[in-house]
A protein has these predicted regions:
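ATP/Mg2+-dependent ligation/transfer catalytic cores
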Residues: 1-2
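Generic helix N-cap/helix-start motif at coil->alpha-helix transitions
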Residues: 247-252
């Protein structure tokens, strides 16, 4: 019988217990991964990245969870593959895909599990008597900057004793931002080109081919004539960046893609 903790680690392989499980049982160095015969995990890692590129979401099925070692191992391997590719767009899309998939899965968790995930991610929440979740103001501000709907602004929130009240869906959205940031930052860690095993290089090439096909299939547009041709949503992000305000990873990706 597989324990719930192990299944949870497979479902959310960015959690510390997933990293601890893998590090206890598998040599995570590139040399070690090559020797462990990690072909099934490598195949799943490629699938993770392709899910992100093609579906904009990394899906994890019940069968994936049962293959918990493969599932946990596929996450750091996917990070290595994306890092090796050194493509900023792929980095951001992969981070978004992992975080979006995690968000959808978190919506089906109990309050207890959701709060546990938040605590492990450094986004601690407290359940109040009305089943609302309370998040410290600095933590909330650090994550909610990614959202621009009026109801996310602090002035429109209920604040109690240094905590912002959020419902479980909003709490999961905050966790999604944290997962996105974590995954993106991990893909920035350099991988020595000479240390990458041959089978990993083939996997990177497979991902690169998918990306190149997506780029080739993009419709071509005539060059913009001026600011008057820019959609309002793009103009708002550009103006924010020109004013020195912090644009989210996703906003910068949108601007770069459009321009």
């Amino acid at each position: 019988m597989i324990g719930e903790n192990v299944l949870r680690a497979a479902r959310y392989p960015f959690l510390p217990e997933a990293r601890e499980f893998i590090s206890r049982n598998i040599d995570l160095s590139l040399e070690g991964l090559e020797k462990t015969g990690s072909e099934t995990a490598l195949k799943r890692a490629v699938e993770r990245v392709k899910n992100a590129l093609l579906l904009k979401e990394v899906k994890v099925t019940a069968l994936d969870e049962l293959n918990y070692v493969r599932e946990m191992l596929s996450f750091p391997i996917a990070i290595i593959l994306v890092s090796t590719l050194m493509n900023e767009y792929v980095r951001r899309i992969y981070a978004l895909g992992e975080s979006r998939g995690a968000y959808k899965r978190m919506l089906h968790e109990s309050d207890e599990t959701l709060l546990y995930i938040g605590e492990k991610l450094g986004v601690k929440g407290i359940l109040d008597q009305e089943n609302m979740m309370m998040v410290r103001v600095p933590t909330y501000l650090n994550l909610a900057y990614s959202f621009h709907a009026p109801h996310w602004k602090l002035v429109n929130r209920v604040v109690d004793n240094g905590h912002v009240l959020v419902n479980r869906m909003e709490y999961a959205r905050l966790l999604q931002v944290e997962v996105n940031n974590y995954v993106y930052e991990k893909t920035l860690e350099p991988v020595p080109a000479g240390a990458v095993p041959e089978n990993f290089k083939k996997a990177v090439n497979a991902i690169s081919e998918v990306w190149n096909r997506l780029e080739a299939d993009k419709p071509s547009y005539a060059p913009l004539r001026g600011r008057e041709d820019t959609p309002p949503c793009i103009s708002r992000i550009v103006k924010k960046m020109e004013n020195g305000e912090n644009a989210s990873h996703f906003e910068r990706l949108i601007v770069a893609t459009f321009m």
